[in-house]
């Protein structure tokens, strides 16, 4: 169990006047417990939950298929198991709420996640419970990482960055996007990642597309190649993107990359505690705008247990940065026929900003032979 996170959650419940909070989404279950129930993210009816009470008791709830995993990872926990296909998911959960003495209580639940039919069944089974939305509570807590989380993200960011470097070093003109995909996934696991998400391999004219996977297209001289992947470790994600050029870059590619490096350095200077997310984006646009290409609506976003989290550094919304935030920052050009992107993982420190994905030197485009 993640004691630091439980303590943060208890303080948040006291401020919100909640008697308990239920972490039911895969990301928030992992936030409380420190581990992912393996099949929950892909078979989302296989409910798992961590119930945290205001007096810091924690009880777990999981489907029978995952009982051995949960019991092995939390052998001392109060764990309730429900049987898949027997229709008893919510009755078992309601019994857990009763046994914790929470009837008549105000309980926070992720109303954005739990299916409406299941929440309605809970309301019928334990009608004297007041169910309150808790998604925003978790979002606010997860924005500020603990020192342990920051170090975890540092490890994962280096794994991901290093895997991309390994992959580019293994290919040359004539290699295919599939070759590059195989190389980066192999390197991720070899370096210690447990999984990956959203693998983007886009070369030549396909580099203009934001989120495409690999094809059998062969790399050609002059191609720009965008390679982005989110390495995963203990439920946390680190998204890194590097752009390579095959053998010889164009003058325009070099011009854009020189601007990206200046944007990178500017962001490293202005990302700091107390800074406004909107002001950061506007300062970024002053430099990026010299290129003459249309920007996307943000240059950065929170990252951690989900691929995109708050805060966003963009034209919508307003956040004040705080130490402990971990962000993905990404100048990107997606133009007609080509694209370039430079994405790093950074953390807001007490003094300013620190890059966590620091394996690759990014002053120049990666060269592929």
Language-model segments: residues:
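Active-site neighborhoods and metal-handling regions in enzymes and metal-associated proteins
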Residues: 1-369
